[in-house]
């Protein structure tokens, strides 16, 4: 099995442009041209993309997603997302809060983001408009000791471990109607610069996300078609994910599946079901450039919803099996 770390290190060693190039190089190799990780099932991790999505649904929403990178490479690493959000009322006003954690690791490189989120929801035009904001803590690290190079004194890796952190912020809007939704967010509002050791730094560009989806009923009440789109732009690269889902909800069963296409990036498919309130989904995303189709990403997501009756005595929370 080929080592992804060795492959990246050999490329960087020939260039010798320092730690910043290392970070940029490894993200390009695994087809993450942008700073933030990309999940194929992006509608499940909406709070990661837009803080205004927290509290969009009535229940406490918990989600864990794991994506492995570059199948066939032993140092490829993975991306983990964990998030929870909930809605609550103060008088006649509705609000949402959430917490998210992203841990993205590939070989000797590690990226972490912890976010605290808030959104205000207001009825508008037969739907609900939410305005949200979040505070982030970004952390980057490079473990130079894991690099396998031909030159033990290579200046790129001779410094050993390099790490740094910085505060950041994001804002967003999200509109939800009966059959459709749309959201727009600006991430990395402060465009922070993260210092890695004494001589290197990583500049994080502001990024813009737009997502939308529509539930299309069919002549069969138990089948729904849901096309959706996510467009991300960081000032340099554009990535658009186009998704088609079909959902079955009948005879006590909830099943769904679909395909996702990101032009110039990847094509993928997924299948999921709801079992005793737990939403379980598996997908495979094949790269259409970079490392190639065979070195794709496996993705597993788990979601769970719990109805909360805050402030109402004598009633216990119980699970919900509504669609995620």
Show where each model-derived region lies.
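Cleavable N-terminal export/targeting peptides
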Residues: 1-36, 307-324
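Subset of outer-membrane beta-barrel
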Residues: 34-324
């Amino acid at each position: 099995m080929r080592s992804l770390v060795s492959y990246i290190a050999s490329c960087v060693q020939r260039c010798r442009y320092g730690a910043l190039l290392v970070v940029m190089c490894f993200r390009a190799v695994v087809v993450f041209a942008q700073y933030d990780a990309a999940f194929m099932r992006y509608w499940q991790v909406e709070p990661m993309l837009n803080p205004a999505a927290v509290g969009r649904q009535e229940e406490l929403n918990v989600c864990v997603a794991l994506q492995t990178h570059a199948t066939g490479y032993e140092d490829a690493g993975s991306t983990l997302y964990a998030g929870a959000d909930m809605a609550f009322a103060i008088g006649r006003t509705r609000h949402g809060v959430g917490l998210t954690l992203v841990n993205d690791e590939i070989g000797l490189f590690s990226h972490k983001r912890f976010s605290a989120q808030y959104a205000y929801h207001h009825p508008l035009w037969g739907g609900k408009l939410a305005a949200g904001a979040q505070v982030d803590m970004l952390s980057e690290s490079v473990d130079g000791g894991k690099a396998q190079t031909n030159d033990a004194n290579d200046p790129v890796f001779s410094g050993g471990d390099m790490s740094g952190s910085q505060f950041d912020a994001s804002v967003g809007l999200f509109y939800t109607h009966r059959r459709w939704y749309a959201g727009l967010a600006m991430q990395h509002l402060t465009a922070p610069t993260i210092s890695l050791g004494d001589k290197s730094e990583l500049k994080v560009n502001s990024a813009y996300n737009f997502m939308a989806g529509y539930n299309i009923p069919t002549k069969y009440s138990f089948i729904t078609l849901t096309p959706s789109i996510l467009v991300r732009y960081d000032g340099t690269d554009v990535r658009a994910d186009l998704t088609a889902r079909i959902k079955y909800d009948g005879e006590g069963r909830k099943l769904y599946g679909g395909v996702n296409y990101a032009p110039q990036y990847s094509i993928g498919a997924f299948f999921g079901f709801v079992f005793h309130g737990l939403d379980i989904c598996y997908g495979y995303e094949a790269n259409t450039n970079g490392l190639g189709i065979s070195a794709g990403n496996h993705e597993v997501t788990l979601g769970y919803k719990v109805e909360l009756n805050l402030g109402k005595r004598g009633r216990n929370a119980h699970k919900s099996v509504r669609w995620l």
